[in-house]
UniProtKB/Swiss-Prot annotation:
Residues 139-166 form a coiled coil. Its main location: cytoplasm. One of its GO terms (biological process) is positive regulation of DNA repair. GO terms for cellular component: cytoplasm; mitotic spindle; nucleus. The gene is Ccdc117. Keywords: Coiled coil, Cytoplasm, Cytoskeleton, Methylation, Nucleus, Phosphoprotein. It is found in: Cytoplasm, Cytoskeleton, Spindle; Nucleus. This is Coiled-coil domain-containing protein 117. Facilitates DNA repair, cell cycle progression, and cell proliferation through its interaction with CIAO2B. The modification Omega-N-methylarginine is found at R47. It comes from Rattus norvegicus. Pfam families: CCDC117. Residues 225-242 have a biased composition (Polar residues). The keyword Cytoplasm applies. Residues 22-69, 216-242, 255-277 are annotated as: Disordered.
């Protein structure tokens, strides 16, 4: 308590300002409380100047890289050995197949190896164009083959349907015995066979019918007495002549009865006119 307010006897007054400043090796960084001497010692590593920002960025990059490396090592340690071997073998096989396929494709299509004068993009473009041409032709052939297969299948199905059809399913015409005998009498035998064959086809439907002689006579029956026929016609004419004048008389009678009514109306109208005068 007595030392407050007066300088300490063990230290010179001239070095008080230097004593309060931090050492140059740890400038810009405060020491945490309770730090020991071995913690305060400088660590080996890439460091910039004490006051430059490049040194801080370098330290940050190194720390991030170390963290990522430790994380990868931890993940690899956690993965089982058998799984590691399987994945490595699969990746190696895929890479080998890809390399072999590219070499075989280049040799098969006749593309020369990369000379010194040509660039890699030009060779890749040429290989892609040749692959497009070779893949386009088989696609057309495959499409034509498929169309031909479909057409053949349709034709085969139609033939199978026609072969499966039975004659019993088709419409047929059954001729009676009387019709057959009538056709044989009037027509030739060959013609009747052709007609029957044509009628048995499904595209034609024809029915032939001939009436029997009892139903329809070939000649009209003559009248028994022509004189009676003339007399009957004359009586019909006279009957119509007598009926016609009777009708005319009936039509004229109402006209005769209507005339006195008109006369009476005319006389009544004349008397009214005289009275008005």
């Amino acid at each position: 308590m007595a030392a407050l307010g007066r300088p300490f006897s063990g230290l010179p007054l001239s070095g008080s300002a230097d004593f309060l400043q931090s050492p140059p090796a740890f400038a810009g960084r405060a020491f945490p409380p309770g730090a020991a001497g071995h913690d305060l010692a400088p660590r080996p590593g890439v460091r910039g100047p004490p006051s430059s920002p490049d040194g801080r960025t370098a330290r940050g990059r190194v720390s991030i890289h170390c963290r990522k490396k430790h994380k990868r090592l931890a993940e690899d340690d956690e993965c089982p050995v058998r799984k590691k071997r399987l994945t490595e073998a699969e990746l190696g096989a895929v890479a080998d197949e890809w390399v072999l396929g590219t070499h075989q494709g280049i040799e098969g299509h006749g593309v020369n190896t990369c000379p010194g004068g040509l660039s890699v993009p030009s060779i890749l473009d040429a290989v892609c164009e040749e692959m497009d041409q070779t893949t386009g032709e088989p696609q057309c052939e495959v499409a034509r083959r498929r169309l031909q297969e479909i057409e053949d299948r349709i034709i085969d199905e139609d033939e199978e349907v026609e072969s499966d059809r039975n004659v019993s399913h088709l419409p047929s015409l059954v001729l009676s015995d009387t019709m057959k005998t009538g056709l044989k009498r009037e027509f030739d035998e060959v013609f009747t066979k052709k007609m029957i064959e044509s009628m048995s086809r499904p595209s034609m439907e024809l029915v032939l019918w001939k009436p029997l002689p009892e139903l329809l006579s070939e000649k009209p029956k003559p009248s028994s007495n022509p004189k009676n026929y003339m007399g009957e016609s004359q009586t019909k004419h006279t009957a119509t002549g007598t009926a016609f004048p009777q009708r005319t008389e009936v039509l004229l009678e109402p006209q005769c009865t209507d005339t006195p009514l008109y006369h009476s109306l005319e006389t009544a109208a004349s008397t009214e006119e005289e009275m008005e005068l």
